[in-house]
Structures are given as structure tokens and as C-alpha cells.
């Protein structure tokens, strides 16, 4: 029994010496004693390759490469102890979830924390850490007693409570495992116990290579290996000079020096012979003087400078994507120009979550074979999502999001269905569920679902059309596709008495859905498309899910569990599932994490993402215990994993390892912005490298090739997939600026795409964008007639929409596009309710031959309640009756109608105007409808403007009959003559024109009427600020002012007094007008003469004719208006259709100048030739 150390700096040949010794031994004595070669898990594959890579050693039974966990498995198979069931990480998390749920009421700190994402991952890691550091539940309990007895501050009490919770959960976890199960850490503890019994290890020659430190548990394994083996050789990265000096925590080799001392101490305790240490002083790894210099002087202070041509490259990239593309281009260049193999190259990084997806995509596009040494979670695979969402459906009362997450996995689809068709049908089905607010009991009820197109609150026709019946049948068929398998599982889960039966219910759910066959079809499809990674994913996920169910049954099969706990435990297990890495092929670029990688024999290393806070890592508290808490436990005798401070001290060694992996070339790069465009800073580590290599120039990597030289641009010509975007970029620049520059070879590349049989069609769509203009072509007369017909019948809102943006009009009224209906109460629904409520009250008053002025406050309240109760079942598929929240909203809406009724009562008392009718139709046909506003357009097309007027009021005096329009609005609005001029606000003046033009036939007395004005009435329940001692009457007066109607009224004092008979001088509280003492109008009055009203009405006719002409002649310009801070695009539903983009030359707003009313009126006169 002996111990031997092989030490040396990085690249000194420690591993090479050991491998050569083993290979020589195998050549000399192929059947001798066992040779064990122990390495970290991530080194096993490459070490195995290196061991049998010699021409004289093509295979071996005598020498085997192991990690500690693989050695444990080997020994336990030999001597026994492997009969207990192994539970993986997913099983550990599931067991911990069950333990926490059963212990929840007794936990002090973790009761609420258990609901946070990642809690069980942290808890599992904490327990694994306890085991690695030989900390038992009794140790933790004793620590709690000690802390509890001396806790005085809040921080100390928190730590004591946290340790108490950990002790409870750790103890329960160990009790659940004992005699039945083994987790990954238990294997190592069993290895310690079983090694003395192993004949396989006894007398073996043992090499331990690639480690820098050992946990206490691993140190015990090393102890037993020294006792059982013939000789143990351990390699450590240490400079021999370091061993001759006192241990200093700031030393580069501090961690490995401590490891060296700990192992020597173990050897002394076991009286193991310590052979003479073998120090390696040369640097055989490095073929580059610059890299040798970097390794030799890495920790020197001040930095030793290297002058001359260096094989170190420093690169700064515009963004993360540019950085990765720069790496990909350089890899291709090394392979093409310098005879590198892909396996000679490695990419090292730390923040993989930011890089891996980008690297997979770009390396595939660049045709670079690669292997990412990182396990991927299975959580996004359709099978995992299907199980998780199906259980959420059942436990969460069939919520919309859970149902359609399950649907979108496509595993509920029948096996033989055409997926494209089913997807379209399910999209329609989802639209139905959103529109009707389907959830909860409606899914499980046997009552068929109804489908009716919503028309209006006044539509009481109960007849169903053929198309509605057809849609209803489809919806109920699709409902059964979705709900039938889930309901079957729901019934089985409710009948289940044990966890085993619940797991069986999940299994039967998957079997009845033919999931194995569906996954096999997905695997075949992935293989046919060349995506072998995803093909293996579909195989792995079924095996892992079945293993998870088996583990669940093995651990908790006979226990009873509530459905909610079963769902939580199962979800926790599913979240922990990971895809196993496929072993790398013989020729791939290795992409690995800096902290976990153990590279050897790579010629070139790319270290990417070298940003501040990443390399070196910023201090960060993670896990269950903070640094301060770990220090307290350490002081009390419980050794755990290093604190953040200790980790930061070790960071220099990590970076040293990082830059000493390559033999020939080192590339260091960082992006200046992340994927979202946020600024990133270069690491101080890059500054250090620059000080060591002052002649190395920092190269900037960009995806914009315009500023690059011709030789640099040529490097951007890689695979057809990635080069296409650069061709586009260059030719777009040429098109926009006419710059020739280096375009000669880019035209050659362009010619490749347009002449290649393979790429001609693939590239045509992309290249056609060179000539793309986001300009809508005018419709032909034939197409216009097909879309709109020979007679246009449209509302005023439609005409205004055309003037806001002709393309939006085309999308809505030509193509009939609309957003999908969602079961929610929007502003238009509330507006419709307000109109209907006020009309019902007004109709009741007319039937009773009463006016608003006749109502009492109590009657206002009663009537508002009655009409809201009548309307609620009719509005938006009974949305106001669908939930407590909507019921509360219904009450608030009733209060608004109540308040509005009171104001209308006050207005009526103060006004000589009385309502003639409400919701007055024109051009709608039927009894009581006024005729439309008709136009014969120059191209022969007839156009009718139709609509419905909220309210028409009438007043009479010795000067005749006056009519005014009142429009109810749920938001504050005024009439802007600038908007009238631009055709954006035509509604009120159109209504006034319709009623005054038809007054002689419409009014009972049969004589003409004059325009009195147009006014907006804001329906709301305002809050007013008053002094503390204000009376109720004063409060009501302030509220009344909030309802002042804005608009435009006839500039006639008598007519204005008819609107507010309390007005003598000053401003009216009812309308936006006021009188001076001399009888003239105040400056802030919104008034117009009768002649001006006539001019405005002519202008409205003129505008409609122009709109009609443009519509029928096919104008669909993408030309939205912009006026001040208002723009047509702000609330437009069709932005994704027109793709309006101000950066394009063709896409610019029609900027409308804001004007004073007087200026707008003057321009209107000019247009119609008014006086």
C-alpha cells in the first residue's frame, strides 16, 4: 500500500504520464492485477478514448476508466448492496414534495417557501450536500439544539428555525429511503463501506486523475482505495514551488494544495507509505510560445509581457449573436485552411442559458458538428406537458389555460387524423371557448354546447340558422375529443385508493391516447428531416416518464394521497426530468461549461461570454443557506460546501484552467449587448490578458459587413443558409445608397442563389424582398365590385375609418377581418349596455307619457336596477352573471346608470328641449326608420350612409322648431372641427343633417326644423373634490358640472336658453356655452351660426362623396393619419396585417396639422364654396 503524487502546472503532462504508464503496463502484462483509472464523470469518455488510443492498446479488460459513481456501481454489483432501488433526481424531488406537504404545518421557514419555483431543487441539493460532507440528520439536530439555545437576534432565530426545518425534512427523507432505496449520494457512502470486501479493488493499481478537490465523502473513498489498493497515484495541478511555501488562500494553487495536504494526512493516519512526489516541470502541451507564456506567468504580479506574434486572439462583438457567428466563421476557417478537425476545437462558456439555443441554431446553419455537454430539461416536451396540463385540468377545475396547453401538445388528437386539419379545427374550437368563457363544470356537463352568433341586445329571435347548427355540431364533436380521455382519467383518479392506482390512471390515459405510437411517428418524422437529436428525445421521454411512474409506485405505491398532492408531486417529478446527453461523435466541436469541463488535447479553445459579473463570477447567494449562515455552521463544526467568498478565491484557478486547455490557439471574446440589446461590459479578465499581450489587437465582430474590407467580407461567405442574409444586407445597402464598394463578389454570390437548382426556389422569397415595397396596390374595378358590390351601404363610422386609414377600411370591410372574440367585458360592450339601459328607461317614460323631469330620485334608482337586470342576461353571453367579479361590476354599472338618470332628470328640468326618440335608425329599413343619406357616385355606384342616432331632442318657440343630437359616450369627448375637416369626426353632423333634412316628413306637425346643435353626453359616475363642510346640494351641483355636455350649438341666445333655462349670464352648467351681460356669447362658447351649420352639412356630403369614390375605385393605401399624439395605428387591430413600418420609404404617416376651430371652419368653407 502506497501513495504517489504526480504534480505540475497545467500542461505539464500529468495525465499523459499516467496514461503512458497504464498503456505500458498493459503491453507488458495484459492479464495482470486490476488497474483502476478514476476521473471526474465528464472526463470518462475522453479518458477511455485516450487509454485505448495507442496503436499497441486497442482494448483492455485489465484497465478500466471509472468515475466514483460508476466504481460504486461496479463494487456493489460484486459484493452486494445494489439490490435497493435507485431513485434519480426526479424521484428525490417527488419524495421531498410529499414529505414537505405532509410536514407543512410543522415547518417554520419553509412552509411558504415550498411554493416557490426551484424550492425542491434547492432542497434536494442541500440534502445531497449534507451527505457529501458526511453530515447526518442527528448532526443537524444537534446543531439546531445548539443554535436554539443561543439565539438572541432575529438572524440567529431565523437560522435556528431553518436548521430545524432542514433537520425534520432530512430525517424524514432518510427514513423513507432506509432499507428500500438509494439516491446518488448513498452509492458513494455504500462504496466506502463495501470497498474492503471487494476482490476487484484489492491489490489494484489505482490512478486518480483530473480532480482538484474532494468532498469529505470522496476523501473517505480515497482513504479506502489507499487501504485496499497496491498503489494509488494522484495527479494534482500544483506548482512545486507552492509546496515549499506556507499555504496562502490567495495563491493560485491554494485549493489543490489543501487537497494535497488532506490526502497526505489521510495517508499518515492509515500508515500508508508516501512515495516521493513526481514534479513535472516542462510544458509539453503548448505548441505556442504565447500560450506557454500565458500559463507560466499567469499569476505573476506585475504581469509579464509577451511581445511578438501571439496565438491569443481577443475579440469584442456587437452582440451575442454576432459573437457566436464570429466563432462559427473562425471554426470553419480553421477546418478549411489549417487542417483542423472539429474535435480539435472546444468552446468554453459559463452562462449557457444565454448561449445554447443560439449556438445550436447557428452551428447547425454553419454545418458545424457539435456536442453541447449540458443536459436539457424535458419540461417542454409534448408528453411531459400533456401529463402536467391534464392533471392541472382535473385539479384546477378545467381552467382554459390548462385545457388548451394540453390540446396544443397534439397528443389528444386521434391517431389517424390529419394534423393540419385538426389544428385548424382546434383553433376554431379555442376561439369558441374564449368567446363563451368555457371552463369548469361546462366541460363535464352532458348538456350540449350552444352556438349563436351575437347580433345585438335587441335581437330576441331564437331561430338557429343552418350554419350555426353545423358549427354547433363541430364544436360538440371537438369537445368530446378533448374532454373524453381527460374525464376518463379524472374518474379513475377519484376512484383510486392508492398512489399505485393513481399512477395506473395516468398510464392508462397515455395508453388510450396511443402516445407510444404518436411518439414513434414523431421520431420517424424527425429522423427523416435529419434532426436526430429530437428523434432520440422522443424515445427518451417515454422511457423516462415510465421510469418516473415506476419510481412513484415503488416509493409511495400503497399510500393514500389527495388529488392535489398527487398533482403537485407528479409535477415536481416531471420538472426534474432531463434528456441524457448522446455521447459525442469522433469529430465534433465540444461546447462545455467552464466550471464542469475537463478538456484535454484540444488545439484551439474559444472562451466566449467573458463579461463582467460572468467571468470572474459575481458573488451570489444561492441555495438554502447564505454565506453568513454557512460561516456560523462552520464555526460550530459542520463543514459544508465553500461559501461565495471561498468560491471567488477559487475563481482565479478556474480561469487559469480555462485558458490553459488549448495547445495552439486561444480565442477570448465578449459581447457588448445581450439578445435584448442591453449593454454588457467586458470583463476585467480581458484587461489582464491585454496587459500580458500588449501587441494583440482587439478585433471587433459585427453582423454589419458594410464597413469591413473585402478580405474580411469574404469570411462571411459560409454556408448557403447563413450567407443569404449577408447577400441581402449588401444588396439592400446598394439599393438604398447606390454604393458599389466590394459588391463584385457579392453579385457572384447572388448569382449562385438565382442559378442553383437547389437554392433557386429556396432563396426566391428572401431575395424578392430586395424589391419589396410595403405599398398596397390599388384594387381593380372588378375586384372592388366583388368586395363591395354595386351598391355600398355603410355607417358613418365606416366612412371615418376610411379617412383614418384606407387599408384598415379594406381589412375590415373588404376582407372582413376581425379579432377573435374573447369572453370579457370591453368598452364597446359597456357602451352598448349604457345605450340599451337609457333607451329602455326612455321608452318606458314615453309609454307612460312622462319625461325625465317627472322622475323622483327613488324612481331613478329603481328603474336603473330594473333595466340592468333585464339587460344582464342578454349581454355578451351572460358575462355579467358569470362570476362574483362580474356581478360586482354589474352593480357598479347600475350605479352609473342611476347617476346618469339623476343628471338627465336635472337636465330635463332645466331645458326646453325634450327627447323625440332614441336609437333612431336611418337607412335601416322597417317601420320608424328614416331614409339613408344617398349618393350617386361619378363611377355609377350607389352609396347609402346608414346608422342609428342615440337621441334626438326637440324644442319649439316663436322662431320655429329646433332639433339637436345627443350622443351618449362612455368617455369624455368634444367636437373638433379640425377632425371634421379631415373627415375623422363626421358622425354628429351627419345625424343632425339626417333629422333636419327629414323633419318635414318625420315630425308629426309636418314642418321643417332648424339645427340647434350636437352634444356629447358623458355617461359616468364622477368623483368630485369638495370642502369638508360642503352641503349635499353643493356636492350635487359639482357633480352636475362634471356632466356638462360638449359639442357645438347654435349661436342663438334664445336657443341656448332653451337648453339651459337657468342661464342668464355666465357659463352654463349643462352645455359648453356662456353669455356675457350684453347678451353676446363668451369666448369659450362652442357655437356656430345656422349658416355655418349648413356649410358643415354640405362639407359632410362632399366628404362622403370623396370617400365613396375612393372606396369604389379601389384605394387601399397604407397611409394612417397622425395628428399630434393621436394616430390611426394606436388602437388598430390590423397592424400585423399591413405591417406598417416607418423605417420603410413607402410607409409614412399622413401628418395632419392641428388648427383652431376658426381656421378649420375657413378651410371647410373653401372646400364647399360656402360664404
From Swiss-Prot:
Enzyme class, UniProt record, top EC level: hydrolase
Cofactor note (record): Binds 1 [4Fe-4S] cluster.
Every UvrD-like helicase C-terminal domain range: 281-587
Ranges of residues in domain UvrD-like helicase ATP-binding: 1-390
Keywords of this entry: 4Fe-4S, ATP-binding, DNA damage, DNA repair, DNA-binding, Exonuclease, Helicase, Hydrolase, Iron, Iron-sulfur, Metal-binding, Nuclease, Nucleotide-binding
Any GO molecular function: 4 iron, 4 sulfur cluster binding
Amino acids binding [4Fe-4S] cluster: 805, 1129, 1132, 1138
Matching PROSITE patterns: UVRD_HELICASE_ATP_BIND, UVRD_HELICASE_CTER
Domain of life: Bacteria
Listed Pfam families: ADDB_N, PDDEXK_1, UvrD_C
Any coiled-coil regions, as ranges: none
EC code(s) of this entry: 3.1.-.-
InterPro entries documented for this protein: ADDB_N (IPR049035), DNA_helicase_suAddB (IPR014140), DNA_helicase_UvrD-like_C (IPR014017), P-loop_NTPase (IPR027417), PDDEXK-like_dom_sf (IPR011604), PDDEXK_AddAB-type (IPR038726)
Cofactor field: Mg(2+); [4Fe-4S] cluster
Single GO BP term: double-strand break repair via homologous recombination
Residues that, per the record, bind ATP: 8-15
Record's subunit section: Heterodimer of AddA and AddB.
Family: Belongs to the helicase family. AddB/RexB type 1 subfamily.
Listed HAMAP family: AddB_type1
Note: Despite having conserved helicase domains, this subunit does not have helicase activity.
Job of this protein: The heterodimer acts as both an ATP-dependent DNA helicase and an ATP-dependent, dual-direction single-stranded exonuclease. Recognizes the chi site generating a DNA molecule suitable for the initiation of homologous recombination. The AddB subunit has 5' -> 3' nuclease activity but not helicase activity.
PANTHER family: RECBCD ENZYME SUBUNIT RECC (PTHR30591:SF1)
Designated name of the protein: ATP-dependent helicase/deoxyribonuclease subunit B
Amino acid at each position: 500500500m502506497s501513495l504517489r503524487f504526480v504534480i505540475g502546472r497545467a500542461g505539464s503532462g500529468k495525465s499523459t504520464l499516467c496514461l503512458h504508464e497504464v498503456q505500458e503496463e498493459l503491453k507488458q502484462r495484459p492479464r495482470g492485477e486490476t488497474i483502476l483509472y478514476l476521473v471526474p464523470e465528464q472526463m470518462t469518455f475522453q479518458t477511455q478514448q485516450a487509454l485505448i488510443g495507442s496503436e499497441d492498446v486497442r482494448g483492455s479488460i485489465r484497465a478500466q476508466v471509472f468515475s466514483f459513481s460508476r466504481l460504486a456501481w461496479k463494487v456493489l454489483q460484486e459484493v452486494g448492496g445494489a439490490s435497493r432501488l435507485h431513485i434519480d433526481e426526479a424521484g428525490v424531488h417527488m419524495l421531498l414534495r410529499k414529505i414537505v406537504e405532509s410536514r407543512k404545518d410543522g415547518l417554520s421557514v419553509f412552509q411558504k417557501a415550498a411554493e416557490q419555483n426551484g424550492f425542491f431543487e434547492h432542497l434536494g441539493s442541500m440534502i445531497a450536500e449534507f451527505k457529501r460532507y458526511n453530515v447526518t440528520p442527528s448532526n443537524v439536530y444537534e446543531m439546531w439544539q445548539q443554535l436554539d439555545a443561543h439565539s438572541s437576534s432575529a438572524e440567529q432565530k431565523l437560522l435556528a428555525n431553518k436548521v430545524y426545518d432542514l433537520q425534520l425534512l432530512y430525517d424524514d427523507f432518510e427514513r423513507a429511503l432506509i432499507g428500500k432505496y438509494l439516491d446518488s449520494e448513498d452509492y458513494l457512502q455504500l462504496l466506502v463501506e463495501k470497498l474492503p470486501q471487494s476482490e476487484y479493488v484489492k491489490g489494484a493499481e489505482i490512478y486518480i486523475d483530473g480532480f482538484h478537490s474532494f468532498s469529505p465523502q470522496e476523501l473517505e473513498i480515497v482513504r479506502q482505495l489507499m487501504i485496499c489498493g497496491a498503489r494509488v497515484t494522484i495527479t494534482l495541478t500544483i506548482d512545486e514551488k507552492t509546496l515549499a511555501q506556507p499555504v496562502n488562500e490567495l495563491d493560485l494553487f491554494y485549493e489543490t494544495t489543501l487537497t494535497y495536504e488532506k490526502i497526505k494526512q489521510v495517508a499518515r493516519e492509515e500508515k500508508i507509505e508516501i512515495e516521493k512526489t513526481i514534479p513535472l516541470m516542462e510544458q509539453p502541451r503548448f505548441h505556442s510560445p504565447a500560450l506557454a507564456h500565458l500559463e507560466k506567468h499567469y499569476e505573476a504580479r506585475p504581469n509579464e509581457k509577451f511581445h511578438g506574434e501571439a496565438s491569443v486572439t481577443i475579440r469584442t462583438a456587437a452582440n451575442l449573436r454576432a459573437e457566436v457567428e464570429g466563432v462559427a466563421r473562425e471554426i470553419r476557417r480553421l477546418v478549411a485552411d489549417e487542417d483542423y478537425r472539429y474535435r480539435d476545437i472546444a468552446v468554453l462558456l459559463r452562462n449557457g442559458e444565454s448561449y445554447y439555443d443560439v449556438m445550436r441554431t447557428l452551428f447547425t446553419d454553419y454545418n458545424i458538428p457539435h456536442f453541447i455537454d449540458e443536459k436539457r430539461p424535458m419540461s417542454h416536451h409534448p408528453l411531459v406537458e400533456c401529463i402536467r396540463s391534464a392533471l392541472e385540468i382535473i385539479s384546477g377545475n378545467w381552467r382554459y389555460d390548462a385545457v388548451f396547453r394540453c390540446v396544443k401538445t397534439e397528443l389528444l388528437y386521434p391517431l389517424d387524423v390529419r394534423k393540419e386539419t385538426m389544428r385548424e379545427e382546434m383553433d376554431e374550437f379555442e376561439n369558441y371557448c374564449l368567446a363563451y368563457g368555457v371552463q369548469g363544470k361546462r366541460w363535464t356537463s352532458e348538456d350540449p354546447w350552444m352556438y349563436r352568433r351575437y347580433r345585438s341586445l335587441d335581437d330576441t329571435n331564437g331561430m338557429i340558422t343552418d350554419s350555426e347548427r353545423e358549427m354547433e355540431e363541430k364544436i360538440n364533436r371537438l369537445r368530446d375529443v378533448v374532454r373524453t380521455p381527460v374525464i376518463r382519467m379524472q374518474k379513475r383518479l377519484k376512484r383510486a385508493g392508492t398512489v399505485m392506482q393513481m399512477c395506473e390512471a395516468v398510464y392508462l390515459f397515455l395508453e388510450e391516447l396511443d402516445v407510444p405510437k404518436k411518439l414513434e411517428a414523431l421520431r420517424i418524422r424527425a429522423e427523416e428531416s435529419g434532426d436526430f437529436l429530437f428523434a432520440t428525445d422522443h424515445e427518451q421521454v417515454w422511457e423516462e416518464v415510465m421510469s418516473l411512474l415506476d419510481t412513484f409506485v415503488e416509493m409511495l405505491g400503497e399510500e393514500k394521497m389527495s388529488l392535489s398532492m398527487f398533482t403537485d408531486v407528479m409535477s415536481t417529478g416531471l420538472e426534474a426530468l432531463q434528456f441524457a446527453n448522446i455521447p459525442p461523435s469522433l469529430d465534433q466541436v465540444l461546447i462545455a461549461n467552464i466550471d464542469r469541463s475537463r478538456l484535454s488535447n484540444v488545439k484551439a479553445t474559444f472562451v466566449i461570454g467573458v463579461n463582467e459579473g460572468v467571468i470572474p463570477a459575481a458573488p451570489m447567494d444561492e441555495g438554502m443557506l447564505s454565506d453568513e449562515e454557512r460561516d456560523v455552521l462552520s464555526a460550530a463544526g459542520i463543514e459544508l460546501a465553500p461559501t461565495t467568498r471561498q468560491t471567488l478565491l477559487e475563481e482565479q484557478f478556474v480561469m487559469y484552467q480555462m485558458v490553459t486547455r488549448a495547445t495552439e490557439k486561444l480565442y477570448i471574446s465578449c459581447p457588448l449587448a445581450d439578445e435584448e440589446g442591453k449593454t454588457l461590459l467586458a470583463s476585467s479578465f480581458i484587461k489582464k490578458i491585454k496587459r500580458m499581450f500588449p501587441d494583440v489587437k482587439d478585433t471587433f465582430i459585427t453582423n454589419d459587413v458594410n464597413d469591413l474590407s473585402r478580405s474580411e467580407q469574404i469570411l462571411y461567405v459560409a454556408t448557403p443558409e447563413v450567407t443569404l442574409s449577408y447577400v441581402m444586407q449588401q444588396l439592400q445597402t446598394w439599393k438604398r445608397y447606390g454604393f458599389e464598394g466590394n459588391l463584385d463578389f457579392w453579385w457572384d454570390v447572388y448569382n449562385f442563389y438565382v442559378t442553383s437548382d437547389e437554392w433557386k426556389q429556396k432563396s426566391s422569397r428572401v431575395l424578392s424582398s430586395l424589391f419589396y415595397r410595403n405599398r398596397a396596390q390599388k384594387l381593380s374595378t372588378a375586384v372592388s365590385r366583388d368586395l363591395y358590390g354595386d351598391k355600398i351601404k355603410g355607417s358613418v363610422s365606416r366612412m371615418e375609418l376610411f379617412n383614418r386609414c384606407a387599408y384598415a377600411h379594406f381589412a375590415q370591410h373588404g376582407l372582413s377581418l376581425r379579432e377573435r372574440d374573447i369572453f370579457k367585458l370591453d368598452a364597446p360592450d359597456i357602451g352598448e349596455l349604457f345605450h340599451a339601459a337609457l333607451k329602455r328607461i326612455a321608452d318606458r317614460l314615453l309609454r307612460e307619457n312622462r319625461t325625465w323631469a317627472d322622475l323622483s330620485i327613488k324612481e331613478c334608482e329603481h328603474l336603473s336596477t330594473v333595466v340592468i337586470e333585464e339587460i344582464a342576461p342578454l349581454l355578451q353571453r351572460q358575462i355579467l352573471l358569470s362570476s362574483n367579479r362580474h356581478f360586482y361590476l354589474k352593480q357598479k354599472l347600475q350605479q352609473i346608470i342611476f347617476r346618469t338618470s339623476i343628471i338627465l332628470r336635472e337636465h330635463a328640468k332645466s331645458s326646453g328641449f325634450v327627447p323625440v326618440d332614441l336609437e333612431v335608425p336611418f337607412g335601416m329599413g322597417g317601420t320608424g326608420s328614416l331614409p339613408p343619406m344617398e349618393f350617386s357616385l361619378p363611377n355609377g355606384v350607389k352609396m347609402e350612409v346608414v346608422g342609428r342616432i342615440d337621441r334626438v331632442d326637440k324644442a319649439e318657440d316663436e322662431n320655429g322648431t329646433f332639433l339637436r343630437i345627443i350622443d351618449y359616450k362612455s368617455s369624455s369627448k368634444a367636437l373638433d372641427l379640425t377632425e371634421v375637416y379631415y373627415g375623422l369626426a363626421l358622425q354628429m353632423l351627419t345625424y343632425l343633417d339626417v333629422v333636419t333634412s327629414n323633419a318635414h316628413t318625420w315630425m308629426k306637425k309636418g314642418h321643417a326644423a332648424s339645427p340647434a346643435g350636437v352634444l356629447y353626453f358623458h355617461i359616468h359616475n364622477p368623483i368630485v373634490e369638495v370642502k369638508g363642510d360642503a352641503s349635499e346640494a353643493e356636492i350635487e351641483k359639482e357633480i352636475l358640472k362634471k356632466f356638462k355636455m360638449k359639442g357645438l350649438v347654435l349661436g342663438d341666445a334664445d336657443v341656448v336658453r332653451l337648453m339651459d333655462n337657468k342661464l342668464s349670464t355666465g357659463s352654463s352648467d349643462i352645455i359648453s356655452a356662456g353669455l356675457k351681460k350684453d347678451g353676446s356669447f363668451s369666448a369659450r362658447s362652442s357655437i356656430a351660426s345656422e349658416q355655418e351649420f349648413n356649410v358643415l352639412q354640405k362639407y359632410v356630403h362632399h366628404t362622403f362623396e370623396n370617400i365613396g369614390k375612393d372606396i369604389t375605385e379601389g384605394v387601399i393605401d397604407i397611409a394612417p393619419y397622425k395628428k399630434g399624439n393621436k394616430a390611426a395605428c394606436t388602437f388598430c387591430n390590423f397592424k400585423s396585417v399591413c405591417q406598417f413600418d416607418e423605417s420603410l420609404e413607402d410607409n409614412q404617416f399622413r401628418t395632419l396639422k392641428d388648427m383652431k376651430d376658426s381656421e378649420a371652419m375657413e378651410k371647410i368653407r373653401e372646400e364647399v364654396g360656402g360664404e
